[in-house]
Amino acid sequence: MLKNPFKKKSIADKYQTLIREINALESTVKTLTDGELRNKTNQLKQRYQDEQNLNNLIVESFALTREASYRTLGLRHFDVQLIGGLVLNGGKIAEMRTGEGKTLVATLPAYLNALTKKGVHIVTVNEYLASRDQTSMGQIYRFLGLETGLIQEKMTTPERQRNYKADITYVTNNELGFDYLRDNLALNIRDVFLRPFNYCIVDEVDSVLIDEALTPLIIANSVKTCVDKYIIASEITDYLELNVHFEIDEKNKSVLLTNQGTIQIEKILGVQDLYNPRDPWIPYVINAIRASSLFFRDVHYIVQNNRIVIVDEFTGRIMPDRRWRHGLHQAVEAKENVAIRQTTEITASITYQNFFLVYPKLSGMTGTAKTAEVEFDKIYSLPVEEIPTARPNLRQDLPDLIYKDEFSKWNAIAKECQNISLVKQPILIGTTTVEKSEMLAQLLQEYRLSHQILNAKPENVRRESEIVAQAGKKGSITIATNMAGRGTDIILGGNIQFKVRKDLYNILVTYKYQTKENKKDSLSRSLQIFPLLKKLQRTSQKFLTVLNCLINNKQFLNLSDVEVLKILNESELIRVPKISYQCSMKFLINELVNFEKKTQKLDNVIVKNLGGLYIIGTERNDSQRIDNQLRGRCGRQGDPGKSRFFLSVEDKLIRLFGDARLENVLKSQLLDDLPLESELVTKILDSAQKRVEERNYELRKNLFDYDDILNKQRNVVYYERRKVLESESARIKILAYGEQVISEITSKLRRKKVFGSQLISRIRNLLGTKFLLNFPSSDLNNLESIDFQTYLLQEFWLSYESKILELEVEYPGIIQEFERTLILIYMDREWKEHLQKMSLLRDAVGWRKYGQRNPLSEYKEDAYKLFKYRGIVTRHLVIYELLRSSIL
């Protein structure tokens, strides 16, 4: 039978040869001892040094990683996971469903690329995931002779440097981006954290490169803030009426004052012009209106410890280090009557779009990338490959139900939970904001339905892993804001490891305190407190013996409760503990797991028979990817599951982006409390969602186009800066600057027809009286411009060298440090000024389209002029400072 030449190759077909070769090598690798397996790493490193070709090492390195994983973690990579590893190594995005083992897949390309000795970064969206993955997967790398690093928020400079020097480093996108910016503000090479970039794997790549693309990373300095104006502007909003004094654009989160509004505000303030540049009120007023009408508590932010903390709309997590720009954050602080912090000016900034493009080799993994593959390809040159599942997907996505209003929708959700809870099927409800999660929790309470809630509130965040892990438990109801980057698998019947760790923690802490207080019969007391111990007394006497020994271990008794909890949490990740009390705790956990297994297996079967986890979405998100992230929480690894979205006509997506067809259908068919289930409505909603996604893509593309211009300039500045930072002496740079400055000064003065003694006087004023100019002024008028420049250059060199010699006698070695630091300080200062100007230019250039001019072309042209001017000013300031400084 002839093959169809037009049939598209499946991903399995693409990598079939390599998979076959890796599998063929498996039996050989299995015969190697642990030492021989470890020695293979050095052999592969040497082969790379000789051949400079990683492709020749793929088969052997993947086979070694698979075997090391089995020996350390008891986990063997499936063939589909090998495919995922090959996709990642090829500089692509691997789309893998929830529960398919992305964390394990990343070990394959990470180990391979670490053989270059240039370092590998594995980027996660939060510290919990980075720490968890480094602890568990680090065992594989260490077994193979590689070092792993972990970057955490409060690490010192030496700790960061040590961890970045590891072969494979786990780090959050936030920490990595800020460390890059800090490196490019360092005044001494000893303070630099990062080595040159090599290879990066981004977990939840769509969250980082798409959802956070519009939010730049910013390092800023505080500047003087007019607090009173923010407070007064906030109070003024109480006297303004929507659509009378101002209009809002909810889609773009913008505000427009009407003429009546302008007059009203000027009257209240007692000023003649809100736009007066000497005493401007307009930015304060606009931000105050935006804060009161478009930014809401427990939706866009929470108030924590008398501070405004932004909530990430895509992940539902708080972002304590982020602040809104251009005075908006201060306006929200004034609205909430909390302390108003100072405004800032940008010192350094970069978007994730441009930051990750610094890597020579980049790849990513996520459960939801296919819907954004055009953007990944056009902006990042990252193709998306869908990885097949190890088992068939049994999830059932039910049609949306749409209700007349929000009241009917929320009541329907509560009733659905009530009905489902009767059969004990677990339910996970996804909400879009903190406010709605709290409101639904209150509603379920009225229905007397027991539930767990996970949102950005600190008291809930602390229990995140446990809440998510137990969402598959029989009869559980869990309310959670968006599920991106939660990182914990939901196991049907409940997660036995989390239950066991919680039970054992309570037992150990109670038992420990009783022992410390020298209470007699602490065991019998514990048996009364914990019924679980009574059951174990009948089945495992060894458990109680080990428990008794542990409680009498002095090292263990000196541990804090937090340290006990940390050891318990890491016990699942560490297969072979090294400390005696860790061994005892590992044994106790294993005993409890074996004891609970029978019950958990039974619950697992029951929940599967009930249909698995039931996902309820309470609103369609702006992006289909976010909806798919929620749906993807059920049906993991061949489990059953179902999902359904409950919607209302008042939902944001329908209200802002629905079209006339949808409105007509809904008005004609919707009745009180009765939902509409229609394929047409679902298609119209999909279409509305697509329009929002296209609009957001255009926003990100537009940002990228503009930011690309600034990024090219940033790359030039950072390259020049690094050369100065790494140089032993900046003397050549100083001399080059001097030549350029003198050339620029003389050319400018001659254009202004300044000659003779007047020329000498002007140059002395500019460069300082110490500048040696002994040339007879009578001869100056007869000199050509180029000859005069040569003379000035010679005098500059002589003046500068004489000062250096004097300084070296008094302060040996200081001049080199001084030269280098001075250049860096002025580079940074002028770059900061340049960023302010570019920001103003970006805001202003948009108006030029009304003059039939292309804003992007205009921006590019003006940006070049500003950048050129920045270079001139930097050179002049450095030379002026060197020649006029008292240190010289």
UniProtKB/Swiss-Prot annotation:
SMART domains to which the protein is assigned, alphabetical: SecA_DEAD, SecA_PP_bind
Group of enzyme by EC: translocase
Gene Ontology MF, one: protein-exporting ATPase activity
Membrane topology: Peripheral membrane protein
Record-listed E.C. numbers: 7.4.2.8
Source superkingdom: Eukaryota
BP GO terms, sorted: intracellular protein transmembrane transport; protein import; protein targeting
GO cellular component labels: chloroplast stroma; chloroplast thylakoid membrane
Major localisation: plastid
NCBIfam families xrefs: secA
Name the record gives this protein: Protein translocase subunit SecA
Organism of this sequence: Trieres chinensis
